[in-house]
Amino acid sequence: MPPHEVWPGSIEAMYQEFMEYSYYVSKDTPTEFDQLLFLLLSEECRNLFEYKFKTPKGGHIDFPETRLDRVQKLWERVFPRNKMLRAEGRLLIQSENSEPFNPLRLSSGEKAVLYYIAGVLFAMPNAVILVEDPEFYLHHSIMKSLWDSIENLRKDCTFVYLTHDLDFAA
């Protein structure tokens, strides 16, 4: 398969740039969803290291809010029965009455929500974000409030929706 063009500022470009400096993880992350999860956790680790080295012994500085923090807040608002857990360098999901599990085991709709939230947070400043079929994989009852919440995460960006759903477009 011939190589494809990687757009500057895309998730794949950010992933490739990070991987140039990473010698301790696999270079093969097959999907953009996997790459987003990797970028979220990598930013979290970088912030933890930075916090550790900038905090004076016995002192305290405020820990900065990460993209993962913002994803988690919106995720748990959209899915109040699901919790996002960080354990031993991994991101896990726990539903009511279940053991924690890998986000790759989420339903298609849950993966879509996680992807949309995280993807928007990694968009370049003042980006125009084109969303084709914003209703894809989403239950109609959460669609409008979800996209309103996602837009509120990035007030600097312009969102353009391509949809056949007249209720959503109204």
Model-flagged regions — what are they?
Residues 132-134:
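Walker B catalytic acidic pair
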Residues 145-150:
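Conserved hydrophobic alpha-helix in the ABC-type ATPase nucleotide-binding domain
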Residues 1-4:
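N-terminal low-complexity, Ser/Thr- and acidic-residue-enriched intrinsically disordered segments
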Residues 162:
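Conserved D-loop beta-strand region of ABC ATPase nucleotide-binding domains
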Residues 165-170:
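Conserved H-loop
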